[in-house]
Amino acid sequence: MKTASGSTKLKATDALDSRPHIFGRTVTSTFRKMFSFRHQPPGNLRTGMIPPVVFLALLVNIPKLLKLRFYLKQERKNRPGDDVRILFYSDNLDETNGIANNLRNVIPYMRAHNMKAFLAGSAFNTRPCGAVENSYCILLPRLFSMEQLGYANSELAIPRVGPVLRLLKRYPVDLIELETPSPGAWLVCFCAKVAGIKVFSHYRTDVPTYTRTLVKAKWMYYFVLWLMKIFYGMTKPVVSPCRDYADILTSQLKVPKNQVKILPRGLPLEKFSPDLRGKGVWEQFNGTEVSAQTVRKVRFSFIGRISKEKNLEFLNNVWKKFAAKHDDVELMYVGYGWYLEEIKKFFEGDSSVHFAGEQGGDTLASLYADSDFFLFPSVTDTFGNVVVEAMATGTPALVSNYGGPHDIVMDNEAGHILPIEENAWLDALEESRRLYLEEPEAYQKMRETAYERTRKYTMQSSTKAQFEYFRKLKKEAYRL
């Protein structure tokens, strides 16, 4: 296989990733193998290595960055002012999460519609080298990586700077949007500033709340909050997908209000449709045959990453009490994550709960459509891709009253917006069950409203708004 740099070839026997294949991702080329520090679990010593590695990587490459600065300045003069080129960078691009999935959908759409967008991140530690997936997603060779504290199957990584510089010379950009405030993003930020590239950020992850939820050490929350203030102070303006987090950026992270821009996200909703309902996909995972079901149960689902910060411990307790009262309800968990085995153990012997594993394509879309109600109690999501996807198949959603999802759902019309209180969720589940069983016309109206609500989150509307903002940002940054 030819490498991204065009210099060497890997052997046909070389494994490109020791993880199971992730749906929809195909390696189209690779980087040559490069030195990296051995991947390690989190620890004080390992964490203490991050700042020296970041600053050493920056210092070593300053001469090349200054040379790149001069090259990009000349190249930019030869292009029209409204010709904007942007690089989206996320350290967690090589994982299964909402950020990675959203970016991997948005960037191909932008490129297909003549928007000059590029996507890069760090290759996961299970890869022997960097790679390019689907001809557009650049997973850079890593210099350093360690497991993320309190968050299995995720890592903190620092990419090698050399390949980044070569790619920026080959594909010059005007703007870099940083998606996550991780070590690699700090390094890219510093390098971009030296190279004279305008850098800004997108508040996609509520890192302080994640830290408070997943890490036992209380001091870590305040330390992370301090780091976030510095990071978002360096990467203004900051894009927020919803009002709640725009307020957090100004109140907690001290970003000036005029430096916060609300830009709702878009999703490729054409693959999600109410027409996929009733095709027999749900029955493949709940242990029954379509013909064998005399009475169809009321179906609830959670679809997404199975991890604790999604507030699934709360959902488990609520469901246990709700299902104890009814034998005509069932809950389907769809997805994979480090918390999955704990949930299976919690529901061991409970016939009302099923697990479909990680799914994609038509199977995933059909599971959304087959659900009667979608449950999403997370209080850490800045947007809620899965909520939009569920509603795009006509499935009403029950969400928390905090974060991005409650901006999507219309309370009592396309679902319910609820405080994180067990009684409130139990009452909503009871009402949802009653509505489905006793008022089919009202339930169908709710499905139609949910579907119509998602039309504002199409890829077309969101990318158009984004690029209009990017053009404005470029003109302000370079005084064009």
What label would you give each PLM region?
Residues 341-359:
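Nucleotide-activated donor-binding/catalytic signature segment of Leloir-type glycosyltransferases, i.e.
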Residues 396-399:
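Short hydrophobic beta-strand element within catalytic cores of glycosyltransferases
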Residues 168, 358-359, 366-371:
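Short alpha-helical donor nucleotide-sugar binding micro-motif in glycosyltransferases
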Residues 411-412, 416-423, 432-437:
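Conserved acidic donor-binding segment of nucleotide-sugar-dependent glycosyltransferases
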Residues 123, 244, 266:
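Carbohydrate-associated surface elements
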